[in-house]
């Protein structure tokens, strides 16, 4: 182990693949870790606290979503099924945060053994992809509801029963490299047993760059293309609709929600994927700047943290803003929800079919 590595570098191995052993193996990019920087790890002291905060808030709001779905009587809507699975993926992702908070608290010393390292590392990756994939499904579903309202009215819940297993299978496949390579390795210089991606030494750089680019493409670029295309298509369609009075208010609400969904996804995940892409470039030898590597090491823990906050935001974007959320909450818990009371605009029964379908955004 070379003596120029800092604690911060180990953070890449929570969702990334910077190695901490076998650094002299052939096939690696020596310039990526020949830097002499050793930034302070003082900033890591705040990470566990922030992880626990996200865990508590995110777990609470997603539990409410899951409870509403499980207690809902009658047939389930396609959009409700997607929201339930999104909340479930977020819950499972958030459930891993206490372990990673402990990992940070002990300066990357994994205390839970190699099996838990492999299982929870894979669990985190699987549900991260599942959450992003279900956000994409929600975007496509809402696009269909607004652009093709008559066809969407004929949708049956059983149609979602095909999509949901497919999404979970895709998430499982995306997490297979993590399940295969994640393991505990002793880092003598740091005096820790780190939970890392233990790629073959002779191909470490290639594997690290490949996995990083895979996460960029499957976890951000492709979903963002779908999400942005769907919501800008909705915006274009609704702006062509002549709406007045309450219909216009509803239309404006939908447009704001469309923008909020796109912005939330970008704000939460763009920093992580930019740093992951830069990390891939260092492994490929395209970037050899020690300053860039230092920035990646310093910023990545907070970028990962920001990505996890998306799991806290999702219930507010897809469930809590609904016109019927207060009524659903009352029917399930049978208590007055005075803190949720506010002005609710009732849509006209004579509005166009496209505007009727906009209720899928706020229901």
From Swiss-Prot:
One of its GO terms (cellular component) is plasma membrane. Expressed at highest levels in adrenal gland and uterus. Keywords: Cell membrane, Disulfide bond, G-protein coupled receptor, Glycoprotein, Membrane, Phosphoprotein, Receptor, Transducer, Transmembrane, Transmembrane helix. InterPro entries: ATII_AT2_rcpt, ATII_rcpt, CCR1-9-like, GPCR_Rhodpsn, GPCR_Rhodpsn_7TM. GO terms for molecular function: angiotensin type II receptor activity. CDD domains: 7tmA_AT2R. It holds the Pfam family 7tm_1. The modification Phosphoserine is found at residue 354. Residues 1-45, 105-114, 182-206, 282-294 are extracellular. Residues 71-80, 141-159, 233-257, 321-363 are cytoplasmic. Disulfide bonds join 35-290, 117-195. Angiotensin II binds at residues 103-104, 182, 204, 215, 279, 297. Coiled coil: none annotated. Gene3D superfamilies: Rhodopsin 7-helix transmembrane proteins. Signal peptide: none annotated. One of its GO terms (biological process) is cell surface receptor signaling pathway. It is found in: Cell membrane. The chain crosses the membrane at residues 46-70, 81-104, 115-140, 160-181, 207-232, 258-281, 295-320. It is a multi-pass membrane protein. Residues 324-333 are annotated as: Helix VIII. Glycans are attached at residues 4, 13, 24, 29, 34. Interacts with MTUS1. Belongs to the G-protein coupled receptor 1 family. Helix VIII may act as a gatekeeper for either suppression or activation of the receptor, depending on post-translational modifications and interactions with various receptor partners. Helix VIII is found in a non-canonical position, stabilizing the active-like state, but at the same time preventing the recruitment of G-proteins or beta-arrestins. Upon switching to a membrane-bound conformation, helix VIII can support the recruitment of G proteins and beta-arrestins. Receptor for angiotensin II, a vasoconstricting peptide. Signals primarily via a non-canonical G-protein- and beta-arrestin independent pathways. Cooperates with MTUS1 to inhibit ERK2 activation and cell proliferation. This is Type-2 angiotensin II receptor. It comes from Mus musculus.
């Amino acid at each position: 182990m070379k003596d120029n590595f800092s604690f911060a570098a180990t953070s890449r191995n929570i969702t990334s693949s910077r190695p901490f052993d076998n650094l002299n193996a052939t096939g690696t990019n020596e310039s990526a870790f020949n830097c002499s920087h050793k930034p302070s790890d003082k900033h890591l002291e705040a990470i566990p606290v922030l992880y626990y905060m996200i865990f508590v808030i995110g777990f609470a709001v997603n539990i409410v979503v899951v409870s509403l779905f499980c207690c809902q009587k009658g047939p389930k809507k396609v959009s409700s099924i997607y929201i339930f699975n999104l909340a479930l993926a977020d819950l499972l992702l958030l459930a891993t945060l206490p372990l990673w908070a402990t990992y940070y608290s002990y300066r990357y010393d994994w205390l839970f053994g190699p099996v838990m390292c492999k299982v929870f590392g894979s669990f985190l990756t699987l549900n991260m992809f599942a959450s992003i994939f279900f956000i994409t499904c929600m975007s496509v579903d809402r696009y269909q509801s607004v652009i093709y309202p008559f066809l969407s009215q004929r949708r049956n819940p059983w149609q979602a029963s095909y999509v949901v297993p497919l999404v979970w299978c895709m998430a499982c496949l995306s997490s297979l490299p993590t399940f295969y390579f994640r393991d505990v390795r002793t880092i003598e210089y740091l005096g820790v047993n780190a939970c890392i991606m233990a790629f073959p030494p002779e191909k470490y750089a290639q594997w690290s760059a490949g996995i990083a680019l895979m996460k960029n493409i499957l976890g951000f670029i492709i979903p963002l293309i779908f999400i942005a295309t769907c919501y800008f298509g909705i915006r274009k369609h609704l702006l062509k609709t002549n709406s007045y009075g309450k219909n216009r208010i509803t239309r404006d609400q939908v447009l704001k929600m469309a923008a909020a969904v796109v912005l939330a996804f970008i704000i939460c995940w763009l920093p992580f994927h930019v740093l992951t892409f830069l990390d891939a470039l260092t492994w490929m030898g395209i970037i050899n700047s020690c300053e860039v590597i230092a920035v990646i090491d310093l910023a990545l823990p907070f970028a990962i943290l920001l990505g996890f906050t998306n799991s806290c935001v999702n219930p507010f974007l897809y469930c809590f803003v609904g016109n019927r959320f207060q009524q659903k909450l009352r029917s399930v818990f049978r208590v007055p929800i005075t803190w949720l009371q506010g002005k609710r605009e009732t849509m006209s029964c004579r509005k166009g079919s496209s505007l009727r379908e906009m209720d899928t955004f706020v229901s």
